A protein has these predicted regions:
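Flexible loop/turn segments at secondary-structure boundaries
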Residues: 16, 72-73, 101, 123-124, ...
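Proline/glycine-rich low-complexity loops and linkers
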Residues: 94-96, 149-187, 305-397, 401-404
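Short beta-strand-to-turn element immediately C-terminal to the catalytic PLP-Schiff-base lysine
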Residues: 131-134, 300-304, 394-397
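An N-terminal, well-structured beta->alpha segment
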Residues: 1-80, 86-87, 113, 170-214, ...
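Gly/Ser/Thr-enriched, mixed-charge loops and adjacent short helices
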Residues: 16, 127-283
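N-terminal small/polar loop signature for handling phosphorylated ligands or for N-terminal nucleophile
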Residues: 55-126, 229-302, 358, 369-374
């Protein structure tokens, strides 16, 4: 099978959600010809993921499933769960979460795979699926081709399920709806301590560089109820401008921001983007806001300029990070869309820093930075950083079960 026949794109499978009941051959036609995603197709994907598990690293059959807040996601999750459980997977639901939370859950639960039901910064009429392996790396092209081929083969078979079994198997083996927020808060607290040990404390180094209050925009998503409160607990004077009761990604979030965007003060006040409209006047160079995308795996900052505001993109964030720890060499990766001067700057800061250029997509950053065996990073391979100008930042984190 050729990669071109794969259902997967740059970052998983995505499509406009239609919840009508269709035959499986029609479900395949819809996703291929009309970019339309149906529960029938998601069931096929679930079955295919189970059947192809032997081609993934790791052991066991646990699959962790999380999702962002889109109106069609519950039906898609039920269909995916049905497919997974029909073919022998043990399914754990962790409820609404960010994509990094799902990544963390794969490690915490020792899962063979993880599935995030999301379409990232796309409108809520869309959804899709991102797949992670037991090490937390996103699926590769060969595996995606394997899954796609299996989907096509399954659609040619008769696999009817009676109503009673369908209802039972659409529910997870283990339901942990409150797990995500608690786990993500705990994880961030650990990371905060690690960053302070590496870069110094927030109160000593950072406040004068940030507006007060500093605006946070979680795109009306998972972090909108708790992230600003977490940051305030750690000394950051900040304010969340999005709302969990509003529509995901609508008039907010990083998805509507270009890495090169700028605004005058008047343009910002007239912007339909909720966070941009609320930006406070600030001294030139001061950071005034941060926006996440819908599934929380991408971030862009906004900085005050002489005449208004400008986006601080992933390249600029990487430069800040490398400058803050220039006393040690980094393994650094950036996509082909990054500024051509970025690698030169990294090696000027520390000549022993190694730089790798990748294709577009944060998974390629992870692949470039991981060990040759595709497994865990170890202390001897740190520090590492991958960046896209769109705001994907890839950094290593201690395994949740690793000793202190």
């Amino acid at each position: 099978m050729t990669v071109s026949a794969s259902f997967f794109g740059t970052d998983g499978i995505r499509g406009v959600v239609e919840l009508r009941d269709v035959e499986e051959d029609e479900a395949i036609r819809l996703i291929e010809d009309e970019r339309t995603l149906t529960p029938a197709f998601m069931r096929l994907v679930g079955e295919a993921l189970s059947y192809t598990q032997p081609h993934l690293p790791g052991e066991g059959s646990v699959v962790v499933v999380g999702w962002d807040r889109r109106p069609g996601n519950q039906a898609l999750v039920r269909a995916l769960t049905l497919g997974l459980r029909l073919t022998g997977s043990r399914v754990v639901h962790i409820g609404e979460c960010a994509t990094p939370t799902l990544h963390r859950a794969v490690l915490v639960f020792g899962a063979r795979a993880g599935c995030m039901i999301t379409a990232s910064h796309n409108p809520v009429s869309d959804s899709g699926i991102k797949v992670f392996d037991t090490f937390g790396y996103k699926s590769n092209r060969a595996y995606e081709a394997d899954v796609s081929q299996t989907v096509r083969q399954l659609a040619e078979e008769d696999r009817d399920v009676d109503v009673v079994d369908r209802e039972a198997l659409s529910k997870p083996d283990e339901d942990r709806p409150q797990w995500s927020e608690t786990a993500h808060r705990t994880w961030l607290a650990e990371r905060w301590g690690q960053f302070e040990s590496m870069f110094g404390s927030w109160t000593d180094a950072a406040p004068e560089r940030f507006a007060s209050p500093f605006l946070i925009d979680c795109a009306n998503g998972f972090g909108a109820t708790w992230l600003a409160a977490f940051l305030r607990e750690h000394g950051v004077d900040c304010l969340e401008v999005s709302s969990p009761s509003a529509v995901l990604n609508e008039g907010c979030g990083a998805g509507d921001l270009s890495p090169t965007a700028t605004w005058t003060h008047d343009e910002a006040k007239a912007s339909p983007h909720q966070m941009i409209q609320a930006l406070p006047s600030a001294p030139e160079g001061q950071l005034v806001a941060a926006a996440l995308d819908g599934d929380g795996d991408r971030c862009l900052l906004v900085q005050a300029t002489k005449t208004g505001f400008a986006v601080v993109d992933g390249d600029a964030m990487a430069a800040m990070l490398l400058e803050a720890a220039a006393d040690q060499p980094w393994s650094f990766a950036a996509s082909i869309e990054s500024d051509v001067a970025l690698f030169g700057h990294a090696q000027t800061l520390n000549p022993d820093t190694t730089c790798t250029e990748t294709a577009v997509g944060d998974r390629w950053l992870s692949y470039a930075l991981r060990p040759e065996d595709g497994g865990w990073l170890h202390g001897s391979t740190l520090p590492t950083c991958g960046i896209e100008d769109s705001g994907h930042v890839v950094l290593p984190a201690p395994h949740p079960s690793a000793p202190d």
